[in-house]
């Protein structure tokens, strides 16, 4: 079915892919993206692991409506999450060489 050395070769390739995925996960965790809201008045810096590293709020917003500020922070966090997901998808696409994965199959993140 696998031919001469086919199964061993397949296992070796799987192990190499696993090692590359581990390295990619480490690189993605170190990556940072910045999500913005309110034309850059609220910025959220997020790691590739989805942890928020920093929130910057323009001082002029401190005088405004608290509810609006909360909405802008939430929007900036959501923008950062979207950017992390795009970056992760792009990097994993590079790793898998554009290999089409079955629907619902998620990489280990």
UniProtKB/Swiss-Prot annotation:
<dbReference type="GO" id="GO:0003677">
    <property type="term" value="F:DNA binding"/>
</dbReference>
<dbReference type="GO" id="GO:0005829">
    <property type="term" value="C:cytosol"/>
</dbReference>
<comment type="similarity">
    <text>Belongs to the YbaB/EbfC family.</text>
</comment>
<dbReference type="InterPro" id="IPR036894">
    <property type="entry name" value="YbaB-like_sf"/>
</dbReference>
<dbReference type="InterPro" id="IPR004401">
    <property type="entry name" value="YbaB/EbfC"/>
</dbReference>
<dbReference type="Pfam" id="PF02575">
    <property type="entry name" value="YbaB_DNA_bd"/>
</dbReference>
<dbReference type="GO" id="GO:0043590">
    <property type="term" value="C:bacterial nucleoid"/>
</dbReference>
<feature type="region of interest" description="Disordered">
    <location>
        <begin position="88"/>
        <end position="109"/>
    </location>
</feature>
<feature type="compositionally biased region" description="Low complexity">
    <location>
        <begin position="11"/>
        <end position="23"/>
    </location>
</feature>
<keyword id="KW-0963">Cytoplasm</keyword>
<protein>
    <recommendedName>
        <fullName>Nucleoid-associated protein AHA_2212</fullName>
    </recommendedName>
</protein>
<keyword id="KW-0238">DNA-binding</keyword>
<comment type="function">
    <text>Binds to DNA and alters its conformation. May be involved in regulation of gene expression, nucleoid organization and DNA protection.</text>
</comment>
<feature type="region of interest" description="Disordered">
    <location>
        <begin position="1"/>
        <end position="23"/>
    </location>
</feature>
<comment type="subunit">
    <text>Homodimer.</text>
</comment>
